[in-house]
């Protein structure tokens, strides 16, 4: 007689084994209709799975994030069902859930077109609207293999042969005549899967290996209701307008080319923004008392072996050789910073020692994963490492948290999600060390009034970690900042200091990044601002335009004055109508468009308008320069107003 404990603490006793669906029905018909799955003793289970002993149960519905993920996974199976009806010869590979949706990789000789995708979507909806039940069967490994062998599903057989133990009992999910294999859970009925859209087609190698066959990957998105789907599609339309690759080209910020995949060619205006970001972070480093250092771009393989990176990271490292020595181009800065720390004897009085670098790093990311500035092979980290004692960890982490929030607020990011990853099963050190480390991070977060979620077991083997994920204007999540404790690397590379009792001790190392990759963060900013950078970041802050040739000399005089004031200014003396010039520079997203006619020239003034079309009237040069300087010094996100 299992006793089921619900989230509110209430208990229900049953005379026999029950499923989540049975419990939901016992509570009420509305909940039974909404039930998608259950979380039984912390583990997600299908709604039909029997609970035979006392258990804690949470009933999952489409209102829960987990419920939406489950219906997305079931939509992948629905896609498989439709594909096999339309092209029975298709061989199905894998169909996982991804952010906001799902995909399925298929082996089909026919090359799918957009018309095919539209037809597939229509067939999926027809199938889902029949509201058929999804039937789960748990079978032996051999029965699962025989089932897929009879259907010619070579990829499912490969998964069974290579990834699943012969002692296992795989779950098969039957969608009428279509059968798929999955860990689950899945929706009990396809009425939950009626708000979806197929988004695109791409190529994908089986198992991500370019030596394997290229498959066709169909991407889709799925949501709990029509409104959520519509909202998501609207956001995607807005995201497409804000795509940093498109805006980067329009504004002539940067380019990339095949001869240097994943490497950025910065143009003048893009590099101007990059340098402004760097200057801003450099001021923060000075404010928080960091040393700025610069390490070599590549180091001998021996050092990477000692640090442990060679064993765990060598596939992602670019290497070269010279004079019978093998070198690796650095994928990260930390081993180099330990080498700088090791120069000269350090005392406990020297700690904490905060070391920062704008480190140029390279990682051999798969070519298929490269995406504009967001995923590159060559990038600059605003990386820092703090060497400190155990007793200093909490205070140092607290300062890092303040620095992260100060920085993000400057760019207008206020919705920050914080997660704390704690000790994994395989780890160095004893429980007492981990207790101190985790408590120090928790207390630092509490001291800053930061709400956080704990991710049990997700920390690195060498220490716990805090992750900062910012949400942009389209509510997309970008994980940028990290604060990571490291109790391993200083020891591996021989870092020590002389303690107060004259003993040699190993410092704790705190890895700290705020923007992460400057390239990626700049890509995020391009999309956040849609290219309309605040004045302090804008590559060109002011453009001055004449109405006739008569004002040309005065325009040049005005621009010279602004440049002497440290304002990024240019002129447009082309023999074009002033309306044409204004439109062109508005499209370039220049914050301030200054027009000069005879009257302005005579009175030593400029007529000021913003890129938003707001007419600010006439101003004396000194007055306008003062207002702009104030905007820049405050790093205001807004332009001047009437």
UniProtKB/Swiss-Prot annotation:
GO biological process, one term: threonyl-tRNA aminoacylation
Catalysed reactions listed for this entry: tRNA(Thr) + L-threonine + ATP = L-threonyl-tRNA(Thr) + AMP + diphosphate + H(+)
CC per GO annotation: cytosol
Cofactor remark from the record: Binds 1 zinc ion per subunit.
CC cofactor: Zn(2+)
CDD domains the UniProt entry points to: TGS_ThrRS, ThrRS_anticodon, ThrRS_core
InterPro entries listed in its UniProt record: aa-tRNA-synt_IIb (IPR002314), aa-tRNA-synth_II (IPR006195), aa-tRNA-synth_II/BPL/LPL (IPR045864), Anticodon-bd (IPR004154), Anticodon-bd_dom_sf (IPR036621), Beta-grasp_dom_sf (IPR012675), TGS (IPR004095), TGS-like (IPR012676)
Location(s) in or outside the cell: Cytoplasm
Residues annotated as transmembrane: none
Domain TGS residues, every copy: 1-61
Keywords annotated in UniProt: Aminoacyl-tRNA synthetase, ATP-binding, Cytoplasm, Ligase, Metal-binding, Nucleotide-binding, Protein biosynthesis, RNA-binding, tRNA-binding, Zinc
Ranges where the record places region Catalytic: 243-534
Binding partners and assembly: Homodimer.
Similarity field: Belongs to the class-II aminoacyl-tRNA synthetase family.
Function in brief: Catalyzes the attachment of threonine to tRNA(Thr) in a two-step reaction: L-threonine is first activated by ATP to form Thr-AMP and then transferred to the acceptor end of tRNA(Thr). Also edits incorrectly charged L-seryl-tRNA(Thr).
Name the record gives this protein: Threonine--tRNA ligase
Source species: Shewanella baltica (strain OS155 / ATCC BAA-1091)
The encoding gene: thrS
